[in-house]
Amino acid sequence: MFNDIPVFDYEDIQLIPNKCIITSRSQADTSVTLGKYQFKLPVIPANMQTIIDETIAEQLAKEGYFYIMHRFDEDSRKPFIKRMHEQGLIASISVGVKACEYEFVTSLKEDAPEFITIDIAHGHANSVIDMIKHIKTELPETFVIAGNVGTPEAVRELENAGADATKVGIGPGKVCITKVKTGFGTGGWQLAALRWCAKAARKPIIADGGIRTHGDIAKSIRFGASMVMIGSLFAGHIESPGKTVEVDGETFKEYYGSASEYQKGEHKNVEGKKILLPTKGHLSDTLTEMQQDLQSSISYAGGKDLDSLRHVDYVIVKNSIWNGDSI
């Protein structure tokens, strides 16, 4: 069955323009609804320690962007929820599937977050299904995102368990080496995997990993994503939590994977690596540029909002769109 589907990735695809119907690109609406809430952009900074911290989460929430706080400072999550709610902001946190997480979820009944993401590398697992059911029993009003997965069967099974959205992508990220360490994943065919999974989905899909350019956001939406999680494009900012390093007079920021030894604190079951990215200005500037580029994408799609991107034609060009050039 699988061998019948076309296999391609972001660099293999070009979207085909339609007649523009807006007089200014600024008229294009990039907003998206997830659950009961509307957000400015269909993008989510990856819930990784070198991408997001509580300060950035607060900034994003205040400015109308969606965020997911990482799960690697377990004791701070409950105070974080309280602090966000005291400011009238949404609380969006991550959990794992260890036994202690069940107690933690139950403890949130009096002050439930609006969003919980179940965040493990291989999300098509009984442990994830059990956690979905537990959250939905204890916190029925909380929107549950579950992942990560890479097949339609996984999407359907997590949806049937009660997940409100699923996160698609196993190993395509810049600092993820799952595909090399295990031989498994969606690296090299992430966009095709997204398309495959989205065709089976009844609820929102979040594309996670493999985004290298702003145009890849539009391509993700074309192939079925409601939201797009991005790591490397959000790493390396002045505000980024990653450690600042100076090399030959230039400043860089550390960026490492959630399954790396740098996050784990030990060299065990490592599926991530660390890289240095040149410091690239403020996060707000990147978000503004993303919005402007997405507005341009909507204008090329011949529409007024994100939905227009879902219906454009495309061609598969097999790695030739750069013509040998790099960005």
Swiss-Prot record:
Enzyme category, top tier: oxidoreductase
Catalysed transformations (reactions): IMP + NH4(+) + NADP(+) = GMP + NADPH + 2 H(+)
Known EC number: 1.7.1.7
GO molecular function, one term: GMP reductase activity
Gene3D superfamilies per record: Aldolase class I (3.20.20.70)
Active site: 176
GO cellular component: cytosol; GMP reductase complex
Pfam families on file: IMPDH
GO terms for biological process, alphabetical: purine nucleotide metabolic process
Swiss-Prot/TrEMBL keywords: NADP, Oxidoreductase
Amino-acid positions noted as binding NADP(+) in the UniProt annotation, renumbered to this chain: 205-228
PROSITE patterns, A to Z: IMP_DH_GMP_RED (PS00487)
Protein family membership: Belongs to the IMPDH/GMPR family. GuaC type 2 subfamily.
Function per UniProt: Catalyzes the irreversible NADPH-dependent deamination of GMP to IMP. It functions in the conversion of nucleobase, nucleoside and nucleotide derivatives of G to A nucleotides, and in maintaining the intracellular balance of A and G nucleotides.
Entry-linked HAMAP family: GMP_reduct_type2
Name the record gives this protein: GMP reductase
Lineage: Bacteria, Bacillati, Bacillota, Bacilli, Lactobacillales
Gene designation per UniProt: guaC
